[in-house]
């Protein structure tokens, strides 16, 4: 059996359709990793590639195409467990986009383990999975006057933005805050 694997990058959904068309002419199947795409984008790609095997390794709402992904609920639950075991009594979340299925699962897992242990989400920032929204989250947290809080970030980009902003503000992590990201970046 002769298998070749190629990796292609499409930065924006507006050039994804063209790239998919080119790839489909020279490949036997596609494994798609595009966590920032919306359902409509997945539908377009799926329609263009009807006769090619196509699997997504990023969560996709609905039954648009076969998906192999992580257990986002369990990831959120484990993040909460880790912060509880670290001794935090106040908790916050830098949540992913509400339109993203996996972001909601991560938040639900985090919230459920907190409730099970007698805690709650005390601070919530709605992010967009970007580094800049992580930086903005720190500003929002500073305005809320919370400190010594365990924070779960729904992805590592936002966690890195939060950490970067914290260092710019001479904060200590751990110390002033603890943070757990998601994605294993």
Model-derived regions, located:
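A short, well-structured beta->alpha microelement
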Residues: 8-18
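Bacterial carbohydrate/catabolite-sensing allosteric modules
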Residues: 1-6, 21-29, 40-185
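A glycine-rich helix N-cap at a beta->alpha junction
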Residues: 32-33
């Amino acid at each position: 059996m002769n298998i070749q694997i190629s990796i292609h990058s499409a930065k924006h959904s507006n050039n994804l359709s063209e790239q998919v068309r080119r790839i489909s002419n020279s490949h036997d199947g596609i494994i798609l990793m595009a966590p920032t795409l919306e359902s409509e984008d997945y539908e377009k790609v799926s329609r263009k590639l009807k006769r090619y095997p196509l699997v997504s390794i990023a969560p996709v709402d609905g039954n648009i195409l076969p998906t192999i992904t992580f257990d986002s609920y369990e990831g959120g639950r484990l993040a909460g467990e880790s912060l509880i075991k670290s001794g935090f009594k106040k908790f916050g979340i830098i949540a992913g986009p509400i339109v993203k299925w996996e972001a909601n699962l991560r938040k639900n897992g985090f919230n459920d383990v907190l409730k099970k242990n007698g805690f709650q989400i005390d601070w919530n920032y709605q992010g967009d999975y970007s580094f800049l929204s992580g930086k903005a989250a720190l500003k929002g947290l500073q305005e809320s006057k919370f400190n010594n809080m365990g924070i779960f970030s729904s992805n590592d980009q936002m966690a890195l933005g939060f950490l970067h902003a914290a260092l710019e503000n001479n904060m200590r992590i751990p110390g002033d805050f603890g943070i757990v990201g998601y994605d294993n970046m």
